[in-house]
Every structure is written in structure tokens, then in C-alpha cells.
UniProtKB/Swiss-Prot annotation:
Organism field: Streptomyces avermitilis (strain ATCC 31267 / DSM 46492 / JCM 5070 / NBRC 14893 / NCIMB 12804 / NRRL 8165 / MA-4680)
Any one GO BP annotation for this protein: 'de novo' IMP biosynthetic process
EC code(s) of this entry: 6.3.5.3
Catalytic activity: N(2)-formyl-N(1)-(5-phospho-beta-D-ribosyl)glycinamide + L-glutamine + ATP + H2O = 2-formamido-N(1)-(5-O-phospho-beta-D-ribosyl)acetamidine + L-glutamate + ADP + phosphate + H(+)
Superkingdom per UniProt: Bacteria
Record SUPFAM superfamilies: PurM C-terminal domain-like, PurM N-terminal domain-like
Localization, UniProt: Cytoplasm
A GO cellular component annotation in the UniProt record: cytoplasm
Lineage, uppermost ranks: Bacteria, Bacillati, Actinomycetota, Actinomycetes, Kitasatosporales
Protein family per UniProt: Belongs to the FGAMS family.
Name the UniProt record assigns to this protein: Phosphoribosylformylglycinamidine synthase subunit PurL
Ligand binding (ATP): Y61, K103, D513, G550
Active site positions: H58, H107
């Protein structure tokens, strides 16, 4: 893109007729014309580079912003929320002076192009968001979705993604404590690689992304800037995949976790010495984002000299330097008298650091190269005033037919033997089978503070050794439910994550989300998106869990075929003492099994309908958010007061899936009795929401029943922990050994 002579601001003003490649950079004609209108002239090549990446779908949220406003407009009152939407990550108060920051992001398209690096840099990016808030990262989670488990391309993509996540996180010394792995043909050619991270700090250590104080220095530190990731935000993250297009591999970033580890320690030491006024990590859009966001969020302007940026490749043009998404880089604003100390800390940690500019008392972002001014813009127009589209949306014509194709009318097992066979088939199916072949590649217990990790209902980390204070996090989403009804599907995702946190004994506090959808240019996809946002915002309001931030990933489709709408929801909770946590595994024989909540004939989008009939149709389970909240309160109280020794939420696969998982984890069987008013099939396979199964010591039975009765929660005794099999009275008996073989051999057989 570089031209001779240098395309300075002065040169651009004098050459209005020069044609710039705006379309190649992802801008629409009207967007380019708006840039010209803002500047009062044509942009320079460097300015065009900045606007193109910052006005991309990935960075500007131009198609989603009009809907995302609901998260603010409907936000519930929360005393816990310290920093909300708009910063690098949300921050919540968890008590005892501690604050926790958490966020979920996506790295979907890069992970298909280059699975290992795409996934690894996804972890690196979300961890830097956490550091930028002032926190020490303490854990990561990874909700993943791939195409059909037996498809050859899944065998190409999944091992690389898993190795990238594990390799990067393990090198950072961060435990991987949660996530999901889901297989569905709709993700063929468009896997979803979502990554989340948690960080811990004291309240007074919170940092924000803003540049203030004229004369303060802008320091770029971390890795050298190279040619990797150029245009990643505008090319990879903001377009539909098309196999006919040229290779997009150069747009995938390359990660170095050891450099990131040094960056973490260096940054935290600078924070501890109060050296930093403002800070921004360099992720999507690189320096274009860091400089424009710091300048627009502060009280002044900024002047930057690109010649001072340390380069890995000396042939890079100024446009490429501004667009590069090379990893492991951060930008700090530091008072002049503290610069030497900041640079000394960087040198101690072997981190390259350079003063590249300073905060000015104006309101312009000016960038220089070889003595010429190549950028002169109002930073707000780059970072915040991009186009906002109210894209047309319409309920798709096929939605009615899809919902009318009722899963409740599918053929059901006609004998006990057939029921038994379908249970085995369910627990051995790729989505319900053990993912230990995958999760064993992650370190769950590094740092020594992990209390719960996969395959528990939520991951849990101790953050204060003396008091036992801890936090739990769960991520959930069900694209099949959302395809049937995106409003309900988003609420079901939140409900399940909320429930998964509560079953461990933690109180849900706040939400982050990763919203994965197809092309916003398709009115049917935009309808799905609008409905999902509306559903999630309404549900967060009712459950009292504000959305603290998150990510939108659009254009998740290959050609004309979009993925299922897949809102992934992360819920963070707090527990006063991790010693009182409740695990999934059955603990002792003789304990009584209770089912909490109502069971109805709800099979739309269910695991049973998929595994047995390869069917998707009907309506997803009903959502009762008041009941969900009540269930959560009872689970938390029962855990805190020692009334239950095990708890497991009921979701995909229904009761039988939950009981089998608890039995296999604890190495103890269960004898179940079908309650009056239910048939065995509905009892075992229904996916009604707002339910959990708990193991109650006999000494606590009366107290537990009294509490549930007093609060109005339906509770049904369904069996006992006993023996070395799962028995459904009058129907079948399945030895744990047979269940374990079915549950644990599927994934290695497909992928190893």
C-alpha cells in the first residue's frame, strides 16, 4: 500500500483524486465516503488502514450495536458491578476487598485457517484483556464447537485447537478449569473457538484504558511488531468464509506464551509501583486500536512516531505497522518522571519497551513516519463513531415448519431393552461422552488454587487462602435450542450456566457472553441475533446478573450456510468458603437421591432426539426464571449448610446423563425409581430446565425436605446411591463398567 512520495496528510489534501483500495480493506463505498466527509479530504493510506480495521464488524460492532444497547438499558441493579460494558473486561466485587475481572472472546475464523496458532492467540488475547484491567490472571476456560465428530476436517481442526489452547495456557501457568466441547455438522468449516479468562485484584488496583495528562509518555512494550495478523480484524473476523478466496493464513497471528508470561509479570510489577496512568493491550487492530482508544477515552490527544516502533520485519510499511496484530504487546501511558523506572522494570523482565509518543493537550491523534505526518484524525471518529447499521431482520419462513416438526411425536422405546440400549447410545454419543481425552491435555491444577475443574458443573478457584474465598465460572450454550427459538435459546444458555454455578454452592453474580452467529446481511440471521439479545437481556434482568461485557462474532458461515445461532454465556459466582463446595460425584453409598424441579415432556432440540433420530424440531424446553432463581438459592443454602454432598444440573441428556456422570465420577452406582405420574422414558430423557439432582445424607433428609417445602420448590425422592450399576427399577440395570466403556471410549476412537 505504500506509495512514493510518502502519503502524508499534506499530500492527501493536495491529491484528492488518488484512488485508494478501500474495498480490499473491507470498507463499503458509503463508509469510505463517510471517512472523506469526516476528514474533509481523502484519507492517507495510513488513515485508511486505521479506519478500515476499526470500522470492521469485529471492532466496531456496527451491525450489533443497536441490539447490544439492551444490556445497558435492561441492566439489573447490582452492588457487585464495579466496571461494566465498554472496558477491556468487566469487573465485579467478590468481597473482602477483592475484585474479579472476567470475559469471553472468540477466535473462530483464525482457528479454522490455522488451528494451533488461532486457538493459542485466542487465549493470549483474552489473558491480555485481563491484565489490562490491573488483575493477575488466575484461570482460563474454553467453550468449543466443531463439525460432526466423524468428519475428516474435525480431525484436522480439533487436535490443533486443543493443542494450541493447552500449549499456551500451560506455558502461562494458568489452569484450564472449564468449558465445553460440542459437535454438530452446522459448525463444519466454521468451528467456534471461544476463550475466557478470570483475573483477581484488589479494588484499588483497577486500571482503565485511557490516556490523560498532557506530556505523559506513550510506551509500547512486549514483542516486536511483525507482519502476522495484518488485517485480522477486517479480513478474518468480519467476512463470510468462502473456499474460493485466496489463502488467509498470513492474517493469523503467531503466539509466544513465554513472551506473554514475561509481559504479565512486567505489567503487574509496574502496576504495583503505581507507574501506569492508562493501559491498553494490542489485540484486534493492533496499534490502530490501542492509540485511538487510549486517546479517545482520555482527556487529551496523542502524538505517535511510528519510526520508534520496534520491528521484527524492517520492510513493513506504516500501514502494515498500524494494522499488525502481532501478539504479546501492550501500550502504557506513563508520567515522564516515571518512565525510567518503567523501562527498568521492562529490562529486568527482558521485555522490549520503547517510548513511541506522548499525550497532547489537543484533541487529535497525530502519527508520524520518516518525519511526515501520515495520520491526523479525531480519535473518537476512529474508535467510537463508526457506522451503525439497523440491518433488516425478519423471522425466517422456515421457522414455523421447524417448530411444527414436534420432537415429542418421535417414536419412543417400546421395551425396557430398547430403553436400555438408547441410554447406552446416548452416553456414548460424541456430545455426551467423556471429553477427558481433550481436557487431559490441559493443566487444571497449576498454581495450586483450583478447587473444581472439568468435568464439574463449574470451575472453581480459591482466591484467598486464609478465608477460603473463591469464585466459580460456568460457560454454556445450546445452538440447537437457539435454532428452534433464539429468544428461549439464549435464556436457556444463561439458565444453565447460572444453575451450574449454583450447584457447586457459589452465588451467581454477573455475566459475560460470546455471541456467535452467521452473516448480518441475512435478515433471518439478524432476526436470530435480535431475538437472542432480547432474550438474554430480559433473563439477566430477572436473574439479577448484569452483563459486564463480551464479544460478538458474526459471519460464521461457509457460503450461504450459517451455523446455528450460538449465544455462549459465562456466569461468574462467588463462594465464601471453597471448603463448602459441592461436587458432581456421588460421595457415599446410602445417600438419598432427590430431583429438584418439575419434569415435563420436553424433547425439542434434545440430545435424545439428536442421537436416536438425528432430528431437530419442535420447541425447546420452557424457561421459568423465577424457578431458576429459587432453585439456585436452595442449592446454595443446602451446600453452605451441609445438607447435600453432591449436586448435578440437568440439561443435555436429561436425568439419566446426569446420574451416569455422577456415578462414574464417584465410582458409585445408583438405584432409581420412576416417580408417580411419569413414564420411564420422560423421567430419564426429558430436558426440562430448572432442575438438578442432589445426593442427601439420610441425617439431613428431613431438614432438606423442610427447606424445599418452605420455599415452594418441588422435590421428589428418586433413589439412592448404591452398588456398582445404574438401575432403573422395573426397567434395566447397567453396570458401571459397561457405562464407563461406552462413555470413555468414543472420543479417543474418533480422534486419537
Amino acid at each position: 500500500m505504500s506509495r512514493t512520495p510518502l502519503d502524508t496528510v499534506e499530500h492527501a489534501a493536495a491529491t484528492p483524486d488518488v484512488e485508494l483500495p478501500w474495498a480490499e480493506l473491507g470498507l463499503k463505498k458509503d463508509e469510505y465516503e463517510r471517512v472523506v466527509e469526516i476528514l474533509g479530504r481523502r484519507p492517507t493510506g495510513a488513515e485508511l488502514a486505521m479506519y478500515s480495521v476499526m470500522w470492521s464488524e469485529h471492532c466496531s460492532y456496527k451491525s450489533s450495536k443497536v441490539h447490544l444497547r439492551q444490556f445497558g438499558e435492561k441492566a439489573p441493579q447490582s452492588d457487585a458491578l464495579l466496571v461494566g460494558i465498554g472496558e477491556n473486561a468487566g469487573v465485579v466485587d467478590v468481597g473482602q476487598g477483592y475484585a474479579v475481572t472476567f470475559k469471553v472472546e472468540s477466535h473462530n475464523h483464525p482457528s479454522y485457517v490455522e488451528p494451533y496458532q488461532g486457538a493459542a492467540t485466542g487465549v493470549g488475547g483474552i489473558v491480555r484483556d485481563i491484565i489490562a484491567m490491573g488483575a493477575r490472571p488466575v484461570a482460563v476456560v474454553d467453550p468449543l464447537r466443531f463439525g460432526a465428530a466423524d468428519h475428516p476436517d474435525t480431525k484436522r481442526v480439533l487436535p490443533g485447537v486443543v493443542a494450541g489452547i493447552g500449549g499456551y495456557g500451560n506455558c502461562l501457568g494458568l489452569p484450564n478449569i472449564g468449558g465445553e466441547v460440542v459437535f454438530d455438522a452446522c459448525y463444519q468449516g466454521n468451528p467456534l473457538v471461544n476463550a475466557g479468562a478470570i483475573g483477581v485484584m484488589r479494588h484499588e488496583d483497577i486500571h482503565l484504558a485511557k490516556a490523560s495528562g498532557a506530556g505523559n509518555k506513550v510506551i509500547l512494550y512486549g514483542a516486536r511488531t511483525g507482519g502476522d495478523g495484518i488485517g485480522g480484524a477486517s479480513i478474518l473476523a468480519s467476512e463470510t468464509f468462502d473456499d474460493a478466496k485466496p489463502s488467509k493464513r498470513p492474517a493469523v497471528q503467531v503466539g509466544d506464551p513465554f513472551q506473554e508470561k514475561l509481559l504479565i509479570e512486567c505489567t503487574l510489577e509496574a502496576f504495583a509501583e503505581k507507574l501506569v496512568v492508562g493501559i491498553q493491550d494490542l489485540g484486534a487492530a493492533g496499534l490502530s486500536c490501542a492509540t485511538s482508544e487510549l486517546a479517545s477515552n482520555g482527556s487529551g490527544g496523542m502524538r505517535v512516531t511510528l519510526d520508534d516502533v520496534p520491528l521484527r520485519d524492517s520492510t513493513l510499511s506504516p500501514e502494515e505497522i498500524l494494522m499488525s496484530e502481532s501478539q504479546e504487546r501492550m501500550c502504557a501511558v506513563v508520567e515522564p518522571e516515571k518512565v525510567d523506572r518503567f523501562l527498568a522494570i521492562c529490562e529486568k523482565w527482558d521485555v522490549i519497551a520503547t517510548v513511541i509518543g506522548e499525550v497532547t493537550d489537543g484533541d487529535r491523534l497525530e502519527i508520524y513516519w520518516h518525519g511526515g505526518k501520515i495520520v491526523d484524525v479525531d480519535p473518537r471518529t476512529v474508535a467510537h463513531d463508526g457506522p451503525v447499521y439497523e440491518r433488516p431482520y425478519a423471522r425466517p419462513e422456515w421457522q414455523d415448519a421447524l417448530q411444527a416438526d414436534d420432537a415429542n411425536k418421535l417414536p419412543r422405546p417400546s421395551s425396557s431393552e430398547e430403553l436400555r440400549d438408547q441410554v447406552l447410545k446416548l452416553v456414548a454419543s460424541p456430545n455426551q461422552a467423556s471429553k477427558s481425552w481433550i481436557t487431559s491435555q490441559y493443566d487444571h491444577f497449576v498454581q495450586g488454587n483450583t478447587v473444581l475443574a472439568q468435568p464439574e458443573d463449574s470451575g472453581m478457584i480459591r482466591i484467598d487462602a486464609e478465608s477460603g474465598l473463591g469464585v466459580a465460572i460456568a460457560t454454556d450454550g445450546n445452538g440447537r435450542y437457539a435454532k428452534l427459538d433464539p429468544y428461549a435459546g439464549a435464556q436457556l444458555a444463561l439458565s444453565e450456566a447460572y444453575r451450574n454455578v449454583a450447584t457447586t454452592g457459589a452465588k451467581p453474580l454477573a455475566v459475560s457472553d460470546c455471541l456467535n452467529f452467521g452473516s448480518p446481511e441475512d435478515p433471518a440471521v439478524m432476526w436470530q441475533f435480535a431475538e437472542a439479545i432480547r432474550g438474554l437481556a430480559d433473563a439477566c434482568q430477572q436473574l439479577g446478573t448484569p452483563v459486564t461485557g463480551g464479544n460478538v462474532s458474526l459471519y460464521n458461515q461457509t457460503g450461504e450456510v450459517a451455523i446455528h445461532p450460538t449465544p455462549v454465556v459465562a456466569v461468574l459466582g462467588v463462594i465464601d468458603d471453597v471448603a463448602r463446595r459441592t461436587p458432581v460425584a456421588f460421595q457415599e453409598e446410602g445417600q438419598l437421591l432427590y430431583l429438584l424441579g418439575d419434569t415435563r415432556e420436553e424433547f425439542g432440540g434434545s440430545a435424545w432426539s439428536q442421537v436416536v433420530h438425528d432430528h431437530l424440531g419442535g420447541l425447546p424446553p420452557q424457561v421459568d426464571l423465577e424457578r431458576e432463581r429459587l432453585l439456585g438459592e436452595i442449592l446454595i443454602s443446602a451446600s453452605r449448610d451441609g445438607m447435600i454432598d453432591a449436586a448435578h444440573d440437568l440439561s443435555d441428556g436429561g436425568l439419566i446423563q446426569a446420574v451416569v456422570e455422577s456415578a462414574l465420577l464417584g465410582g458409585k452406582g445408583a438405584r432409581l425409581v420412576v416417580p408417580d405420574g411419569l413414564d420411564a422414558f420422560t423421567f430419564l430423557f426429558s430436558e426440562s430446565a430448572g432442575r438438578a439432582v442432589v445426593a442427601v445424607p439420610r441425617s439431613e433428609e428431613l431438614r432438606f425436605n423442610d427447606m424445599c417445602g418452605a420455599r415452594g420448590l418441588p422435590v421428589t425422592r428418586i433413589g439412592v446411591v448404591d452398588g456398582d450399576s445404574v438401575e432403573v427399577q422395573g426397567e434395566f440395570t447397567l453396570p458401571l463398567a459397561e457405562l464407563r466403556k461406552a462413555h470413555e471410549e468414543t472420543i479417543p476412537a474418533l480422534l486419537a
